[in-house]
């Protein structure tokens, strides 16, 4: 361990990441604007409350901002003027977003360099793992492992409420002190905005996603290390982490402050558990084990103290719920999953005597959360809150083919994402809402009723465009339709789904799994 610690310290001493001069380069903001998630962080007229900064973008604003940064000192800003100041120029709100967007692009550079260096010589593994990048790759793991487990900890990862916590986390990665001071000042400027002003602004998604991911990376680095110390079976790999950040320095602090003892290994030995699984998606993570309820309660207190002492965050134990898998629906990655007992009858025969044996087999069920789905569709104006399909007035001015293609795109994406559900009745209901909403939208455009429009266009008008892949197979091969129908009713995990964020239209994203 001392040799590894010495190597880590030597590697850190060689790192000289001077990122601060890049803040004054115009091309950085051009790259950041092109790669931005919102693509509209620059604007000339930020007067609209609902659509702020939606007008044409111009790098002239960036040039003026860089000129002001060269001339003025940020620490001499007058706090009396909330709209304009010496450093941030004509509009404090707009310039804060520009600076944060550019800084998000800049600070990713050391992460990318470390990632490239850590992956050298592993190109074959990378190419081989490209097919396993789907969100659905989690569910085969759950089906294979969760059926043997008893309890699960449903954890909501806390987000830091203070800017200084985020800055302290980044200092392990970014060795440039001026950049960290700049980040601290920019975050203070952003969070000093009033709440109504923040509601009108488009959140800088890329920047805050980066901050959150760095925060979670720090948490998981220490957590996985401690979990390995408390387990008979060490984790073979953990590919998400780019570097184990200050493990061996923090373990001494955790041993004296958090664990209240100097021997971390001896204390962790009290909760030895050979079978424990950890899965995270966005802000939620689950920790499942074969242990008893008492064992899981120990880990619950362990994690709460871990967040409070190491990250200086108040983490209430209510954020962690301990539930048995056999009667608990776990809301995770857009599914309601559970490991319930399913009866299975087996006929056995010994010589001339035959008898039936009733067995109970634990299987992982993945269900569609129908009520959140209907609520999401209602917000996107495809139906009302009761699930009754309605027309989409915004799309009524489009061409017929464009309307059908949009509805078909949404229907196919939802069908692919929820094709792994155990019960398809809810999926049929969602597809019915979208198909009838498409028919109502077309009837609204042609100023007719749905029945009259379908009679004029033909009964197969919508089926040709909204037919799913499974329906298409049954229609193409009618002789094998019975066998294909059995496949259609079974679970199908599409391993090419990484995200679905373009289901509704260009301005509003429908995310039915949240």
Swiss-Prot record:
The molecular function terms in GO held by this entry are: RNA binding
What's the short name of a Pfam family annotated to this entry?
MatK_N
Which family is this sequence assigned to? Belongs to the intron maturase 2 family. MatK subfamily.
Instruction: Provide the species name.
Output: Plantago argentea (Silver plantain)
Q: Which UniProt keywords apply?
A: Chloroplast, mRNA processing, Plastid, RNA-binding, tRNA processing
Protein's name according to its UniProt entry: Maturase K
Phylogenetic classification of the source organism: Eukaryota, Viridiplantae, Streptophyta, Embryophyta, Tracheophyta
Q: Which InterPro entries match?
A: Domain_X, Maturase_MatK, Maturase_MatK_N
Is this entry keyworded Plastid?
A: yes
Q: Where in the cell is it found?
A: Plastid, Chloroplast
Q: Which gene encodes it?
A: matK
Answer yes or no on keyword Nucleotide-binding: no
Predominant localisation class: plastid
Query: May I have one GO cellular component term?
Result: chloroplast
Q: What does this protein do?
A: Usually encoded in the trnK tRNA gene intron. Probably assists in splicing its own and other chloroplast group II introns.
* Gene Ontology terms: biological process: mRNA processing; RNA splicing; tRNA processing
């Amino acid at each position: 361990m001392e040799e590894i610690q010495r190597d880590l310290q030597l590697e850190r001493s060689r790192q000289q990441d001077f990122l601060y001069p890049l803040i004054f380069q115009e091309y950085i903001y051009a790259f950041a604007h092109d790669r931005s998630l919102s693509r509209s962080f620059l604007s000339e007229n930020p007067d609209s409350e609902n659509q702020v900064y939606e007008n044409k973008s111009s790098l002239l604003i960036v040039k003026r901002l860089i000129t002001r940064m060269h001339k003025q000192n940020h620490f001499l800003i007058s706090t009396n003027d909330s709209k304009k100041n010496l450093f941030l120029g004509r509009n404090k709100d707009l310039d804060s977003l520009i600076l944060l967007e550019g800084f998000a692009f800049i600070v990713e550079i050391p992460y990318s360099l470390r990632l490239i260096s850590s992956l050298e010589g592993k190109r074959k593994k990378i190419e081989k793992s490209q097919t396993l990048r789907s969100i659905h790759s989690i569910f085969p793991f759950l089906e294979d492992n969760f059926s043997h487990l008893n309890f699960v900890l449903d954890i909501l990862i806390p987000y830091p409420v203070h800017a200084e916590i985020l800055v302290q986390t980044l200092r392990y990665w970014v060795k440039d002190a001026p950049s960290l001071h700049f980040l601290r000042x920019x975050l203070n400027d952003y969070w000093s905005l009033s709440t109504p002003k923040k509601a009108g602004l488009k959140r800088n998604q890329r920047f805050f996603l980066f901050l959150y991911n760095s925060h979670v990376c720090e948490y998981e680095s220490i957590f996985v290390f401690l979990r390995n110390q408390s387990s008979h079976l060490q984790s073979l790999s953990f590919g998400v982490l780019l570097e184990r950040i200050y493990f061996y320095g923090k373990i001494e602090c955790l041993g004296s402050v958090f664990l209240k003892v100097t021997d971390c290994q001896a204390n962790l030995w009290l909760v030895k558990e050979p079978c424990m699984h950890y899965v995270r998606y966005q802000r939620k993570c689950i920790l499942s084990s074969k242990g008893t309820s008492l064992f899981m309660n120990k880990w619950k207190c362990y994690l709460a103290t871990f967040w409070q002492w190491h990250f200086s965050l108040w983490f209430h134990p209510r954020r962690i719920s301990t539930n048995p898998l056999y009667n608990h629906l776990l809301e995770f990655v857009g599914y309601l999953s559970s490991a319930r007992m399913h009866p299975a009858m087996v006929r056995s025969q010994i010589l001339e005597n035959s008898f039936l044996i009733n067995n109970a087999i634990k299987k992982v069920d993945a269900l569609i959360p129908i009520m959140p789905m209907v609520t999401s569709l209602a917000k996107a104006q495809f139906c009302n809150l009761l699930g009754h399909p309605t027309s989409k007035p915004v799309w009524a001015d489009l061409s017929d083919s464009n309307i059908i293609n949009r509805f078909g795109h949404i229907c196919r994406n939802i069908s692919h994402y929820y094709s792994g559900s155990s019960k398809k009745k809810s999926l049929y209901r969602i597809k019915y809402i979208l198909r009838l909403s498409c028919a109502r939208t077309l009837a609204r455009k042609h100023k007719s009723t749905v029945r009259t429009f379908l009679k004029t266009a033909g009964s197969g008008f919508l089926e040709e465009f909204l037919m799913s892949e499974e329906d298409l197979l049954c229609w193409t091969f009618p002789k094998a339709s019975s066998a294909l129908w059995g496949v259609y009713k079974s679970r199908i995990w599409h391993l090419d789904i990484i995200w679905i964020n373009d289901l509704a239209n260009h301005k509003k994203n429908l995310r039915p799994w949240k």
